[in-house]
From Swiss-Prot:
Part of the 50S ribosomal subunit. Contacts protein L20. The keyword Flavoprotein does not apply. Transmembrane segments: none annotated. One of its GO terms (molecular function) is rRNA binding. It comes from the Bacteria. Keywords: Ribonucleoprotein, Ribosomal protein, RNA-binding, rRNA-binding. It comes from Shewanella loihica (strain ATCC BAA-1088 / PV-4). This is Large ribosomal subunit protein bL21.
Length: 103
């Protein structure tokens, strides 16, 4: 069984037991969180597609950790002006483990 749900403006395809990195959520480590914006739920035989959401669809997950991703380097450069600027960015994330999918 798998589901597609929406969180942080992105869609994620998950199954029970999967670990997913989402945009940062203000939830403490070890707590349970429910995602109700479920777009699709499928088991071996049937597929429930929402219009736009599946009625009664819910994905339950446990928060494992919070952290920051790999550094992305940004370089701005102006030719012939002796001007260059180098910056970096590390995006915060929340890592969750999917515990249940309800249709």
């Amino acid at each position: 069984m798998y589901a597609v749900f929406q969180s942080g403006g992105k869609q994620h395809r998950v199954a029970e037991g999967h670990t997913v990195r989402l945009e940062k959520l203000e939830v403490a480590t070890g707590e349970t969180i429910e995602f109700d914006q479920v777009l699709l739920v499928a088991d071996g035989e049937t597929v429930h597609v929402g219009a736009p959401l599946v009625e009664g669809g819910k994905v339950v997950a446990e928060v494992i950790s919070h952290g920051r991703g790999e550094k992305v380097t940004i370089v701005k450069f102006r030719r012939r002006k002796h001007h260059d600027k180098k910056m970096g960015h590390r995006q915060w994330f929340t890592e969750v483990k999917i515990t249940a999918i309800n249709a």
